From Swiss-Prot:
It comes from Trigonostigma heteromorpha (Harlequin rasbora). The gene is shh. PANTHER family: HEDGEHOG, SONIC HEDGEHOG PROTEIN. This is Sonic hedgehog protein. GO terms for cellular component: extracellular space; plasma membrane. Pfam families: HH_signal. Keywords: Autocatalytic cleavage, Calcium, Cell membrane, Developmental protein, Hydrolase, Lipoprotein, Membrane, Metal-binding, Palmitate, Protease, Secreted, Zinc.
Amino acid sequence: YGKRRHPKKLTPLAYKQFIPNVAEKTLGASGRYEGKITRNSERFKELTPNYNPDIIFKDEENTVMNQWPGVKLRVTEGWDEDGHHLEESLHYKGRAVDITTSDRDKSKYGTLSRLAVEAGF
């Protein structure tokens, strides 16, 4: 005990690269489609809120910090009910998230994607 693991080198994801390398709505990536979760459904209560102060949530209804000091993770879309996605979108189930960084530097997106994969998203 007491041994510190060396951090592994993170390889940025390429634009439009998926982990696993299949489309997000396939059975292997996201499981069986179980229907849209609406605000009034019982399953809505199963969604877990995230109150992490290091994440800026875009308010459409009115681990990044360690990689880029002073930069925060910006969630632009998570669970959604507005109907702007495809019928079986994972956003309606609370199983998809769109993210950027607070500085909106697109050169960081590949590494940001890799960090999300490493975090289990």
